[in-house]
Amino acid sequence: PKHIISWIEEPSLDLSALLMKEVDLILATGGEGMVRAAYSSGTPAIGVGPGNCNVIIDDSCDIRTAVASIIHSKTFDNGMICATEQHVTILENIYDEVKAEFANSRCYFLNKDEADKVAKVFFNAKTHGVNANAFGRSVLQLAEMAGITVPEDTKVMIFETDDTSHDNAWANEKLCPLLGMYKAKNFDEALDICAKLVYEGGAGHSAAMYCDPTDNEKIDRFALRMKAARILINTPTCFGGIGDLYNFDIAPSLTL
């Protein structure tokens, strides 16, 4: 039908506020300020929160499948889907093997100086959110913006860190092809790291794990510990989180 879709050509805060008062329902996808404005508008609203999906790579998993799935997910639409992996937590006894698999799959590991430069591009320290000009940028665009050089065939840039604090850019949501990487001594520590990252940066959103699919005890421990609406096992989180092809148990939606 005519006029079923319309938009504001030159958006402003005043026009957005006016629009929110004139509609029957608001579906608010955006920053915290915009979601808060929607909830305060007097119009029924559904707000979408940030995702800070951490993925545990357990020593019982198929490493090649796990790494390939994460890269497949993280590179779709340059990582813009909010259910996409933001960092991985790897058990110590397989850490080097997993790292090598990422490297062999054309992921680039940043040193500290490079990581700091990239962080200035994507991370807004005041809001702990993503800078708007970094959304959905390709690896090469991000590298150019940061003033660093990476191989032209790089799929994802990765930074190894042990800092899970909310002030660490790499511990937060990154809606572009960037990953943080953590090492855990054992499964218990992996649960601690994953739970902290998910809760502080994306409570109620998504968490994932790659493991032996028959290990129900481990899967149950993970599911009960994570404060997330979507618990994904052996699944690329971008696709598993939005439902359909990789997860028919969830109704398809790009608004999470």
Which role fits each region the language model picked out?
Residues 148-256:
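Conserved C-terminal structural/oligomerization subdomain of aldehyde/semialdehyde dehydrogenase
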Residues 22, 41-42, 226-227:
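Short, structured coil segments at secondary-structure junctions
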Residues 26-38:
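Glycine-rich phosphate-binding loop
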Residues 5-23:
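A structured beta-alpha segment of the ubiquitous adenosine-cofactor-binding alpha/beta core
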Residues 3-9, 27-30, 45-48, 110-112, ...:
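General beta-strand structural signal in soluble alpha/beta enzymes
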Residues 9-14, 33-34, 214-216, 238-240:
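Short acidic loop-to-helix transition motifs that present clustered carboxylates
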Residues 35-165:
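ALDH superfamily catalytic-core signature
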Residues 1-3, 217:
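A glycine-rich phosphate/pyrophosphate-binding beta-strand-loop-alpha-helix module
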